[in-house]
C-alpha cells in the first residue's frame, strides 16, 4: 500500500486525490492520535487550522474541522496565514494540534494537509504512520451531545499575534532599506509586507492580490524572473520572494542576481557566529545544498551537518543536536530560537537585519559563498520506487561520478510530493554539469 504522507504532509489534486471525504477521515484520525494525551485530564482538546488562499482550501478546512470536531476537538480556524504562523499559534494558544492546508509552491489545483503536534512541531514518520493506520480503524460513531467539538471561525487576533512574534524575534530598524516583496498571491500576502513595513523598510509588494485562483501563477519563489525585473525597475536594495504558504524565502540583490537558500544560510551563519548565537558552531543543511556552501563554511571555520532532503529532517537534526540554524537551498530556513519550522518572513527580516547591521549590500554579503555550477532536472516518472533499482541507472551514475572525479558530485532522489525523480549534478564547469545531468536524466526517463 502506498504511503499517504509524503515528505511534507499529504498532497494531491484537490477534489480528485485529495478529497473532502479524505480530509474528514484525516481530521478524525489525527484528532484521535494527537489529542489522546489530553483526554485523561478531562480537558477538551483544541486544534488550530490555517490555510493558504487557493480555492479548495475552504472546502478542505471545513471537512478537516468536521472530522476533528466529530472526535471531540474544538477547532479554531485562523483563516489565511503562513504555515509558520500555524506552527507558532499552535504553541502560542496552547493548542494540542495544528493543521495547515496548503500545497506550498505547487500549482493552484493541488492542495495539501500538514499536521503539527502540541508546541507547533512537525510530525515524525511513526506518528504519521499511526494516523494512517487509525484512519481505517476508527468507528464512524463518535462522542455525542456535550462531547462534540465546536468550530470557531476566524480568530480575530491570530494574525496580529503572529506579526508581533515576528517583530519580537528580529527587533531591528530597517529604515533606509527598500525591498520588493513577491508574495506569490499566497499566504505571505497577509503577513510579509506588513512585517517588513513594521520594521521600517520601504516595501514594494508584487503578486499580493490573491483571488483563490492565482496562487503561484508565474510568481513567487519558483518564478524568480518576476522579482528580478521588479528589483531593477524600482532600484530596490533587494527583493524577497516567497512561496504559496510563505515558509520559504529566496532573495535577489540590487543587481538582480538570485541569492538562494544556501547563500542565505551562509550569510546568517557567519552573522550568528560573530554574535555568539551559532550554537556549537554548526549549520545544518541537506544533501542538495551546493558544494560551495561546504567550502564557505570551512573557510569561516563553521561545521556543516547534512541531512536528507526536507525541512522536517533539518528540524530533527537541529533539535537532536541543539543547533541554532539550518535550512535548504530552496529557501526553507529554520531558526529554532524563534520558530519550530521554516519561516520565509522571519528569514527576510533576518537577512535585512544583517544588511542594516553591517551597512553592506546583499551582493557583498552573498559573496561569502561561491556557488558551484549546479544543474537540477526534474524527470516525470511513473514509478519512483523502481528508478534506483535499474541497472542502467546505476551504470549511468557510476559513469558520471567517474567523469566528474573529485570536482563535482551526482545526486538522484525521488520527489516527496510529486511524481518526479530529481537529477542533480555539480561540476567545475556549467557545461559539464549540464551535459552529465542531461545524460543521466535521459536514462532515468527510460528506466
Swiss-Prot record:
Which keywords annotate this record? Isomerase, Magnesium, Metal-binding, Phosphoprotein
Cofactor binding annotation: Binds 1 Mg(2+) ion per subunit.
For this protein, the record's InterPro entries field holds:
A-D-PHexomutase_a/b/a-I (IPR005844), A-D-PHexomutase_a/b/a-I/II/III (IPR016055), A-D-PHexomutase_a/b/a-II (IPR005845), A-D-PHexomutase_a/b/a-III (IPR005846), A-D-PHexomutase_C (IPR005843), A-D-PHexomutase_C_sf (IPR036900), A-D-PHexomutase_CS (IPR016066), Alpha-D-phosphohexomutase_SF (IPR005841)
What family is reported? Belongs to the phosphohexose mutase family.
Q: Entry's SUPFAM superfamilies?
A: Phosphoglucomutase, C-terminal domain, Phosphoglucomutase, first 3 domains
Organism annotation: Corynebacterium efficiens (strain DSM 44549 / YS-314 / AJ 12310 / JCM 11189 / NBRC 100395)
Q: What is its EC number?
A: 5.4.2.10
- Cofactor annotation: Mg(2+)
Binding-site positions, Mg(2+): 104, 243, 245, 247
Q: Which residues carry this modification: Phosphoserine?
A: 104
Point out the gene that encodes the protein: glmM
Give the Gene Ontology MF terms in alphabetical order.
Answer: magnesium ion binding; phosphoglucosamine mutase activity; phosphomannomutase activity
- State the Pfam families in the record: PGM_PMM_I (PF02878), PGM_PMM_II (PF02879), PGM_PMM_III (PF02880), PGM_PMM_IV (PF00408)
Catalytic activity annotated for this protein? alpha-D-glucosamine 1-phosphate = D-glucosamine 6-phosphate
Protein name per the record: Phosphoglucosamine mutase
Catalytic residues of the enzyme? 104
Please name the HAMAP family in this protein's record: GlmM_B (MF_01554_B)
Q: Which GO terms describe its cellular component?
A: cytosol
What does the entry give for GO biological process?
carbohydrate metabolic process; peptidoglycan biosynthetic process; UDP-N-acetylglucosamine biosynthetic process
Briefly state the protein's biological role.
Catalyzes the conversion of glucosamine-6-phosphate to glucosamine-1-phosphate.
State the post-translational modifications: Activated by phosphorylation.
Amino acid at each position: 500500500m502506498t504511503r499517504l504522507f509524503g515528505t511534507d504532509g499529504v498532497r494531491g489534486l484537490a477534489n480528485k486525490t485529495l478529497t473532502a471525504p479524505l480530509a474528514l477521515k484525516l481530521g478524525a484520525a489525527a484528532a484521535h492520535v494527537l489529542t489522546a494525551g489530553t483526554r485523561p485530564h478531562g480537558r477538551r482538546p483544541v486544534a488550530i487550522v490555517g490555510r493558504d488562499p487557493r480555492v479548495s482550501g475552504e472546502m478542505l478546512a471545513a471537512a478537516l474541522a468536521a472530522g476533528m470536531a466529530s472526535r471531540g476537538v474544538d477547532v479554531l480556524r485562523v483563516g489565511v496565514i503562513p504555515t509558520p504562523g500555524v506552527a507558532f499559534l499552535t504553541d502560542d494558544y496552547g493548542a494540542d494540534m495544528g493543521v495547515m492546508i496548503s500545497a506550498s509552491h505547487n500549482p493552484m489545483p493541488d492542495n495539501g494537509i500538514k499536521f503539527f503536534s502540541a508546541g507547533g512541531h512537525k510530525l515524525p514518520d511513526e506518528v504519521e504512520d499511526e494516523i494512517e493506520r487509525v484512519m481505517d480503524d476508527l468507528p464512524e460513531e463518535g462522542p455525542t451531545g456535550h462531547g462534540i467539538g465546536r468550530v470557531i471561525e476566524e480568530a480575530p487576533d491570530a494574525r496580529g499575534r503572529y506579526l508581533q512574534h515576528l517583530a519580537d524575534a528580529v527587533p531591528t530598524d530597517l529604515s533606509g532599506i527598500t525591498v520588493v516583496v513577491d508574495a506569490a498571491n499566497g499566504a505571505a500576502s497577509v503577513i510579509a509586507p506588513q512585517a517588513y513595513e513594521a520594521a521600517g523598510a520601504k516595501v514594494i509588494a508584487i503578486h499580493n492580490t490573491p483571488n483563490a485562483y492565482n496562487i503561484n501563477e508565474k510568481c513567487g519563489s519558483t518564478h524568480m524572473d518576476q522579482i528580478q525585473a521588479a528589483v531593477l525597475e524600482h532600484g530596490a536594495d533587494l527583493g524577497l520572494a516567497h512561496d504559496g504558504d510563505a515558509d520559504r524565502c529566496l532573495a535577489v540583490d540590487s543587481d538582480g542576481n538570485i541569492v538562494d537558500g544556501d547563500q542565505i544560510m551562509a550569510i546568517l551563519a557567519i552573522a550568528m557566529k560573530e554574535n555568539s548565537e551559532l550554537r556549537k558552531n554548526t549549520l545544518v543543511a541537506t544533501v542538495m545544498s551546493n558544494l560551495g556552501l561546504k567550502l564557505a563554511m570551512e573557510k569561516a571555520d563553521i561545521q556543516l551537518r547534512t541531512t536528507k532532503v526536507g525541512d522536517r529532517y533539518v528540524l530533527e537534526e537541529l533539535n537532536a543536536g541543539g543547533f541554532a540554524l539550518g535550512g535548504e537551498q530552496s529557501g526553507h530556513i529554520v531558526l529554532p530560537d524563534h520558530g519550530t519550522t521554516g519561516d520565509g518572513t522571519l528569514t527576510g527580516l533576518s537577512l535585512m537585519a544583517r544588511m542594516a547591521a553591517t551597512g553592506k549590500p546583499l551582493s557583498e554579503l552573498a559573496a561569502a559563498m561561491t556557488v558551484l555550477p549546479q544543474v537540477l532536472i526534474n524527470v516525470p516518472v511513473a514509478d519512483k520506487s523502481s528508478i534506483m533499482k535499474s541497472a542502467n541507472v546505476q551504470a549511468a551514475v557510476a559513469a558520471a561520478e567517474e567523469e566528474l572525479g573529485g570536482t563535482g558530485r551526482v545526486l538522484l532522489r525521488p520527489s516527496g510530493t510529486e511524481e518526479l525523480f530529481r537529477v542533480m549534478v555539480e561540476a567545475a564547469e556549467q557545461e559539464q554539469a549540464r551535459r552529465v545531468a542531461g545524460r543521466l536524466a535521459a536514462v532515468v526517463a527510460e528506466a
